[in-house]
A protein has these predicted regions:
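Short Cys/His-rich micro-motifs in 6-15 aa windows
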Residues: 9-10, 96-98
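Sequence/structural segment immediately N-terminal to covalent heme-attachment motifs in c-type
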Residues: 19, 57-83, 93, 100, ...
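Extended intrinsically disordered, low-complexity coil regions enriched in Ser, Thr, Gly, Ala
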Residues: 11-13, 84-85, 101
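Membrane-embedded segments
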Residues: 1-8, 12-15, 22
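Extended non-catalytic domains of envelope/secretory-pathway proteins
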Residues: 8, 43, 51-54, 66
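Axial heme c-ligation environment in periplasmic c-type cytochrome domains
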Residues: 2, 22-42, 57-60, 86-90, ...
Length: 147
């Protein structure tokens, strides 16, 4: 992920950054096609997800896919804004970690995705973890930046 834009999956506080560095993270989105329905339902849902961020989409497909979003809401929230506690991304912004567009979203719904950031606690000293935490936090919290 981009560490400079201030959009964090698990929280961008120094404490959360350090926790991520020490313990690592496993991101898991299971395949959701069976919960969504038919391949046509998955395609419609993909257009609804695109609509959440104002991305180009087919309005009719998006309206048909809206009711299928219930399968996504447990992790991404009913509003699609994500849940940092789960590492579920915000679907209403223009940040697409694993590709953008109908094909990429459909593939994610059909196949799911597992990512891992390995724990660094066995590789770094306490001092190194502190310095790295400050560095990563500072990359997205530059002096004078308005947020």
């Amino acid at each position: 992920p981009n560490l400079t834009d201030g959009h964090w999956l698990h929280g961008g506080t120094p404490e959360k950054i350090r926790e991520t560095l020490e313990k690592g993270r496993i991101g898991n989105m299971p395949p959701m096609a069976a919960a969504v329905g038919s391949p046509e339902d998955v395609r419609n849902l993909s257009h609804y997800v695109l609509s959440l961020s104002g991305s180009p989409h087919d309005s009719l497909r998006a309206s048909l896919g809206k009711s299928k979003f219930v399968a996504c809401a447990a992790c991404h929230g009913a509003d699609g804004k994500g849940m940092q506690a789960l590492g579920a991304p915000n679907l209403t912004d223009d940040i697409w970690l694993h590709g953008w567009g109908e094909a990429a979203i459909t593939a994610m719904i059909n196949n799911g995705k597992v990512n891992q950031m390995p724990a660094q606690s066995q590789k770094l000293t306490e001092a190194q973890l502190g310095v790295l935490t400050a560095y990563v936090w500072g990359m997205s919290n530059k002096p004078g930046s308005a947020r």
